[in-house]
């Protein structure tokens, strides 16, 4: 079987796709004669969707040098009053015996050159070390969040209170231009009494114990102060910082539709975009899981209508619980029932609303698209960057508030919406209209668009033969051979 690199994906479609893209990058650069890729993934998580098996079959067929190892099903224990993050960390720990067994089996027929684990799979780090396999992290967000995670054990020492109670108290991270409000920390650390808090401390403190960290970003995108803070050891003041390899942007260009109805809707929205003037359409999409209650959807609709701008808006079914910002899967629903009465008719000449899904990578590359309202999930950010499209930053969950901070203040790639500093992060119609007009009509929006266009060119150059990301990939491979 030869040399193999084993990748271990955290639960969920997005994490699996990111690992596949890393595997494809390695195989594309070095060919299957150099390395084969085996991707380990779990079964039984609450975030599993029916699209995962079909996706894996498709990748297995189109990329024969990438194979998959699905673990036996583990029951995701749902415990009342425990956060989803804590439940997920526990689920990943329950899979540790399967990780050990998989590495044992693979090692019988191949030389495992590296074991690359998702950040959230930290419990597998000592297993890789146990087999004397160089073990690396794959960080699927940007350098700013990596800097924050590396430094978080020091932040933990600064207070004994929960960040959710500290609210507007600000904390400084090495290299960041502006501090972060306590309430905007990543969700798993907001409540010190939740088990997820200690899980996060554990994984942040173990990042430096790896052989290195592979990051889905590129050097030119990142603020130099943040790159210097990481490289200079400011984020890990009490010990050595492992090598960091910025190899992005890794983007899934092969997303496939789930059914014929989705295919027809895709064709309709792309055809509509082709008929619109250049850079005139605002695209609104909040990720595969981002969802709003009906009251927020109505505010967005009223803001869009008042702005007078053209728009393509992806609307997902509102969550059952009003405060929830995530949905899993794609359920059908009555679109007109969740929007203001008559909205679709009044905006039909300049707007299009689609249910649940649109081909985001393709949409962002359309000439007619001039702006993107995003939840600041890192994959979506990179897709916009590559397409050269400026953003309106509207974070919902996970590390997205951190991404928003850096996109707006440090990178100057986005305009931020003002959200109510409550759990729901509510945005009113007037703020929606204001930010839409600012991006699509103002001189500041035009300058932002020019900046984003240049960054898109840099993204492509980073992956070129002499680009920074190619150089970093070569350095990573050199470290394991």
From Swiss-Prot:
Gene3D superfamilies, per the entry: Glycogen Phosphorylase B
Swiss-Prot/TrEMBL keywords: Glycosyltransferase, Transferase
The organism's place on the tree of life at top rank: Eukaryota
Binding site for UDP-alpha-D-glucose: 288, 357-358, 375-383, 397-400
Enzyme Commission code: 2.4.1.-
Xref: Pfam families: UDPGT
Bilayer-spanning residue ranges: none
Family annotation (PROSITE patterns): UDPGT
Example of a GO MF term: UDP-glucosyltransferase activity
Its biological purpose: Glycosyltransferase that may possess chalcone and dihydrochalcone 2'-O-glucosyltransferase activity.
Similarity remark: Belongs to the UDP-glycosyltransferase family.
Protein name (Swiss-Prot/TrEMBL): UDP-glycosyltransferase 88F3
């Amino acid at each position: 079987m030869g040399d193999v690199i084993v990748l271990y994906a955290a639960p969920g479609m997005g994490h699996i796709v990111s690992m596949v893209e890393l595997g494809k990058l390695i195989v594309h650069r070095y060919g299957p004669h150099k390395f084969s890729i085996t991707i380990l993934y779990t079964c039984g998580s609450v975030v599993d969707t029916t699209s995962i098996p079909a996706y894996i079959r498709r990748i297995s067929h189109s990329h024969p040098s990438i194979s998959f190892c699905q673990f036996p099903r583990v029951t995701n224990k749902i415990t009342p009053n425990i956060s989803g993050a804590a439940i997920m960390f526990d689920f990943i720990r329950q899979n540790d015996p399967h990780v050990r067994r998989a590495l044992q089996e693979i090692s019988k027929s191949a030389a495992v050159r590296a074991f690359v684990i998702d950040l959230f799979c930290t419990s597998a780090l000592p297993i890789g070390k146990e087999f004397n396999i160089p073990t690396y992290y794959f960080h699927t967000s940007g350098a700013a969040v990596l800097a924050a995670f590396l430094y978080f054990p020091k932040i933990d020492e600064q207070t004994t209170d929960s960040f959710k109670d500290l609210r507007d108290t600000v904390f400084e991270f090495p290299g960041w231009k502006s501090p972060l409000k306590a309430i905007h920390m990543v969700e798993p650390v907001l409540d010190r009494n939740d088990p997820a808090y200690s899980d996060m401390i554990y994984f942040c403190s173990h990042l430096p114990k790896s052989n290195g960290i592979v990051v889905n970003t590129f050097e030119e995108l990142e603020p130099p102060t943040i790159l210097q803070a990481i490289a200079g050891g400011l984020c890990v003041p009490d010990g050595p910082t492992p090598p960091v390899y910025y190899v992005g942007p890794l983007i899934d260009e092969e997303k496939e539709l789930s059914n014929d109805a989705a295919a027809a809707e895709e064709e309709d929205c792309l055809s509509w975009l082709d008929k619109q003037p250049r850079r005139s359409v605002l695209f609104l999409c909040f990720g595969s899981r981002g969802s709003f209650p009906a009251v927020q959807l109505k505010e967005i609709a009223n803001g869009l209508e008042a702005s007078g701008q053209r728009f393509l808006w992806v609307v997902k079914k509102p969550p059952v619980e009003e405060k929830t910002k995530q949905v899993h899967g794609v359920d059908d629903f009555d679109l007109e029932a969740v929007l203001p009465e008559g909205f679709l008719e009044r905006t039909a000449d300049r707007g299009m609303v689609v249910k649940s899904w649109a081909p985001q990578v393709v949409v962002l590359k359309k000439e007619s698209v001039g702006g993107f309202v995003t939840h600041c999930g890192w994959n979506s950010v990179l897709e916009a960057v590559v397409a050269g499209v400026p953003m309106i930053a509207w974070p919902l969950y996970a590390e997205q508030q951190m991404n928003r901070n850096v996109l707006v203040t440090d990178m100057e790639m986005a305009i931020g919406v003002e959200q109510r500093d409550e759990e729901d992060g509510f945005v009113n119609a007037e703020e929606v209209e204001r930010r839409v007009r600012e991006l699509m009509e103002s001189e500041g929006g035009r300058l932002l668009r020019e900046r984003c266009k240049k960054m898109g060119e840099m993204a492509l150059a980073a992956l070129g033969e002499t680009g920074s990301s190619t150089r970093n990939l070569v350095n990573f491979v050199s470290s394991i051979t």
